């Protein structure tokens, strides 16, 4: 859902992040995750930044793993568990205050044109 984030504060960046499993949300997001994983493989996407985000959640900060094709995997920073995945629009990527080269912008635009950012589950 768009516009439901009341708080999104960029805390900083991580050099490394260890993934430690999944939350119960994984089942609810299996279709979107499948498409995102396919995009990462088919487009040869690489991690370009790992951002720490404070959304004011009781379980703590999130680690947003941003790929150079606009896919963002979101984990709990403390537990390392997967929460969700975004096939992001350009404004969502720009919130991370990272350089968005033309090739990345084009991939994001292509995903949006195909409606991939609208996949609910």
Residues of each region from the PLM?
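Ribonuclease/tRNase effector modules and their secretory precursors
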Residues: 1-121
């Amino acid at each position: 859902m768009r516009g439901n984030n009341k708080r999104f504060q960029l805390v900083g960046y991580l050099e490394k992040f260890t993934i430690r499993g999944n939350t119960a949300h994984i089942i609810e997001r299996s279709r979107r995750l499948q498409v995102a994983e396919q995009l990462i493989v088919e487009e040869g996407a690489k991690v370009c930044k790992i951002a720490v985000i404070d959304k004011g959640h009781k379980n703590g900060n999130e680690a947003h793993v941003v790929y150079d094709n606009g896919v963002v995997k979101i984990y709990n920073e403390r537990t390392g568990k997967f929460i969700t995945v975004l096939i992001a629009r350009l404004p969502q990527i720009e919130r991370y205050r990272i350089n968005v080269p033309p090739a990345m912008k084009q991939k994001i635009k292509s995903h949006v044109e195909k409606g991939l950012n609208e996949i609910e589950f």
